[in-house]
A protein has these predicted regions:
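RecB-family 4Fe-4S metal-dependent nuclease core
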Residues: 1-253
Length: 253
């Protein structure tokens, strides 16, 4: 379960704060030291670009980190949770440091069978009673493309991570624990918002999830991959940005 592994989130600054407590100045100083180490490593690799722009970017990052600590304190207080796990691996081989992670998430999909899912969730929090878990998936960009989650937490099957994360942790924690999940935008650009505004439970989206995943799985099994480029955006189409074959498709797709 999660509770015995709380030490994974504890570092040289000692115990984590309780849900209603803000982060300490010691925690803030540690975060800044870690950031400075990352800055130095990036500079040593020569990937930081022009000096003036890099200086501005560094200041923006440090400002985001300070705001993150404040936003995190508000989030922990709102949901009554505190961090217990980071980089929650499930269904994957042992990590480089030998950490086994959690078992793969599984779900019986009507008409398809049992599907297994693997991945990594950024963070898992628990409340003090151990009866509520909150899984957070960090996002560093804009929240504009996530607005649809207000009405549909899986966006018509485009965003399936959150229910899968709840499956993975539910299996580890037990059915008596309520497991919720949300995307959290952890920068000024994303305004530190969470989406959906109320973290999602699998029970809320089970029917939609099963239908979407079932359609995807059946299509793969039958070799059906319909072209769906999405809406036209600057420089291409919304569904094609990360496709390896984007340049092979006709421009008037």
């Amino acid at each position: 379960g999660l509770a015995p592994r709380r030490g994974a989130c504890q570092g040289e600054e000692g115990p984590l704060p309780s849900p209603e407590e803000p982060w300490s100045e010691e925690h803030r100083d540690l975060l800044h030291r870690l950031a400075q180490q990352s800055f130095a490593e990036a500079e040593a690799r020569g990937v930081t670009g022009k000096a003036l722009l890099w200086e501005l970017q560094r200041e923006a990052i440090l400002s985001d980190l300070d705001a993150f600590l404040a936003a995190d304190a508000e989030l922990r207080d709102r949901f009554g949770v505190t961090p217990h796990l980071v980089e929650v691996r499930f269904g994957l081989p042992r990590s480089a440091d030998g950490e086994p992670g959690l078992e793969a998430a599984q779900r019986e999909i009507p008409g398809v069978g049992t599907l297994r899912f693997r991945g990594v969730a950024d963070r898992g929090d628990l409340d003090l009673s151990g009866n509520l878990a909150l899984v957070l998936d960090y996002k560093t960009g804009s929240a504009s493309s996530y607005q649809a989650l207000k009405d549909d937490p899986i966006d018509g099957g485009k965003r399936l991570q959150l229910p899968i994360y709840t499956l993975a942790l539910q299996k580890s924690l037990g059915e008596e624990v309520t497991v919720r999940a949300a995307y959290w935008f952890v920068s000024a650009r994303g305004r530190y918002a969470i989406f959906p505004p109320e973290p999602v439970e699998m029970a809320q989206v089970a029917e939609r999830f099963d239908r979407a995943v079932g359609t995807i799985a059946q299509g793969i099994a039958e070799g059906v991959f319909p072209a769906n480029p999405g809406s036209e955006v600057r420089g291409g189409f919304s569904n094609c940005s990360y496709c390896d074959f984007n340049t092979l498709c006709p421009s008037r797709r």
